[in-house]
Each structure stands twice: as C-alpha cells, then as structure tokens.
A protein has these predicted regions:
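Segments forming glycine/polar-rich beta-alpha architectures that bind adenosine-containing cofactors
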Residues: 354-355
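Signature of the SF2 helicase/ATPase Hel1-core->accessory helical subdomain module
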Residues: 101, 128, 204-221, 226-334
C-alpha cells in the first residue's frame, strides 16, 4: 500500500495543512488510468478536429466573384500574415473588407501560419458582421469553431450578476457539470453564439459566461470586444497571461481589429485610473465595526493620498517611484478586501463595498 498526501497552503499566512490517505497500488492504478482516459477523449477530439478543420480550409474557395480591389486586399492580408507584419487598411464602406480579411486569415490558419483568429470590435453590429462572415464560409464548406464573447452582465441569467454559489444556482456545482456541457457542445455545434451558449448553459445548469470563456479554448475564431485582449484588468489570461503562448508577429494568434482608430481612445481608458481620497474615508467608516484590519489599511491609503495631495498643489506630474507608499497600500488593501468579501458574502455592507 502507498500513502498519498495532499497539501493546502494559505497564501497569506503560509500555514500548511496536510491530508494523508492510504491506497493500494491497484486503487491508484485504476484512478490514474481512468484520469488518462478522461484526458484522452479531449486529446483525441483535438487531433481529429484539427484534421477536419485543415482539410476544409484547404478546399475552401472565395464565396463570390471578387469585387474591384478585393482580391488585392486579400492578397495583402495573407502576405502580411506569412511575413509576420502588421497591416493597416482604410477603404470605403461596401468594399467587403470583412470577408477580404477573414478569408485570408482562415487560409493562413489552414496552412499552419496561426493557431486561431481573434476578431476584435467595439460595436455589436460589427460583431454580427464578422459572425455572419464565418457563417457564410461555413455554408461553402468551412469547418471552424467560432465563439462570440458576450459581457458577463448581459449574458448572466440573474437580474444582477452574483457569482456566489449560494446566490446563483448556475454557479453552484458549475465545475461538476462544465466538462460534460463543453464536450456536448464540441460534438454537436461549431457556432457558439449567445443563443447556443445560453441553451447549453441552461441544459447543464452552468454559468453561461464561464461556458463561453471555456469554449474559447476550443475555438478557432474568437469574436469579442477590444478589452478581452488589451484591457489589463479583463484580458483573457488563458491566452495572454504569464506562461501562455505569446501574441505578436509570427505567433500563434491573428488579430483582425475592426475600426482600429477607435483603439487609441479605448486604450487610454483601459490604462487610466482615478482614486478619490473621500472614497477611502467613506469606506473606512463603513467597515469600522466589521473589520479593524480593513479599517487600518484604508486609513494608511487615506494618509498616503493626503501626503500626495499636499505635494500636488496646482498641477504636477509625479514619478511612479514617489507613490510607492500608496501603490503598496492599495495592493495590500485589495488582497485583504478580496479575502474579506469571500468570507463575508452575507455582510450587510457587502454590496455598498462592491459599489
């Protein structure tokens, strides 16, 4: 027989807890090989799907007779991908830019020049145009899986999004059912738009937003807002986080950015932040009777802001190194606040704090 130990580590206190069980070699073998079988079905599907996808792409032809300039545009796009270059396109409405960029991008995926396509847009209507373009190509024989990512507050089944399992029946037990929901979707659908995601989420009682994110891992095309790639707070860590495959020229991902000129202003918004001193004071008064540690950390942030306020009479740009006290205080506060909210999901001030 063999002893197996599982170790839990508290990230804040570094306290360790050990759980030890004893099993026979046969029990461990059965567990291990059953686990391998579960992984194998996903690996088999991935391998077989890649063959199906690649064969369909290589057989795909442009769905219409080329309009004036369309063939040249598609050629520029394909050559830019092959050479690992960036391409900026400006053309009148009605030229067929979407099809002329999506088609060569799809062809590049079929030739192994990229792993998947991200179609980024800021508007629902252009998201629909991109989706319709993939559907058009499917009608001509393309086999690619595409997903449209919808904002959590729009796709959530609750009136107000609350991911607490005690409040949301779709969050409770989500991870017990999500694999079955995903596998069913993979076997029977290629087009993961909002209605399909919601249908399967209800059928398997899982979170529709998390289901769409999980399906993105198995999708060849992802249609989404700019922020899923560029926003430092909500970007898709499964693709762009530390340790993931990197983006960029010659990398595994292609980015088709609709109305890219809008990205400048959106980028400013994504990378800008405002902290109001009075908000820290109000929050401090709110939590005073519930948690002294939180109160102290809020007071430290307030003190740091007060010191900066004195230094900034009039207008002055402060180097980042001069706000270390504030940055460190806010980081500690964020960590403590996150833990407190998890542990006090029924606190009378929880909603006010979140606001």
């Amino acid at each position: 027989r063999m002893k197996v130990r599982m170790t839990y580590c508290n990230m804040e206190t570094e306290e360790l807890r050990y759980f030890t069980q004893e099993y026979s070699v046969r029990e461990l073998e059965e567990w291990f090989f059953s686990l391998l079988e579960e992984y194998k079905k996903w690996a088999d599907f991935g391998y077989e799907w890649q063959q199906i996808r690649t064969d369909s792409i290589r057989a795909l032809v442009f769905p219409y007779a080329y309009r004036e300039g369309q063939k040249e545009l598609a050629g520029y796009v394909y050559r830019s991908i092959v050479r690992g270059k960036k391409l900026f396109i400006e053309a009148p409405t009605g030229v067929g830019k979407t099809l002329s960029t999506v088609f060569p991008a799809v062809k590049a995926v079929g030739e192994g020049k990229a792993e998947r396509i991200f179609y980024l847009t800021a508007k629902t209507i252009t998201r629909t145009v991109a989706d319709n373009t993939f559907q058009l190509l499917r009608g001509k024989g393309l086999r690619m899986k595409t997903v449209i990512l919808t904002a959590k507050d729009k796709i959530c089944f609750l009136e107000e999004a609350d991911c607490n399992p005690a409040a949301c029946p779709f969050a409770k037990g989500h991870y017990d059912r999500i694999n079955e929901a995903m596998y069913d979707l993979l076997l029977h659908e290629d087009h993961y738009h909002r209605e399909t995601i919601e249908e399967y989420a209800r059928r398997y009682q899982v979170c529709p937003f998390e289901l769409s994110l999980d399906m993105s891992l198995f999708s060849d095309g992802i249609i989404c807002d700019y922020n899923y790639v560029f926003d430092p707070h909500v970007y898709l860590k499964r693709f762009f986080g530390e340790g993931s495959q990197t983006q960029g020229a010659g990398g595994p991902y292609l980015f088709l950015i609709d109305e890219a000129h809008n990205l400048v202003e959106r980028g400013r918004e994504m990378y800008s932040a405002v902290l109001v001193k009075e908000d820290f004071l109000a929050l401090k008064r709110m939590v005073k009777e519930y948690d002294r540690k939180l109160e102290r950390q809020l007071e430290k942030c307030n003190t740091a802001l007060l010191a900066l306020k004195r230094e900034c009479e009039g207008f002055r740009v402060i180097p980042v190194k001069e706000i270390d006290d504030l940055v460190n205080g806010v980081e500690r506060l964020s960590e403590t606040m996150g833990s407190w909210l998890e542990e006090h999901d029924e606190s009378p001030v929880r909603e006010e704090i979140l606001e």
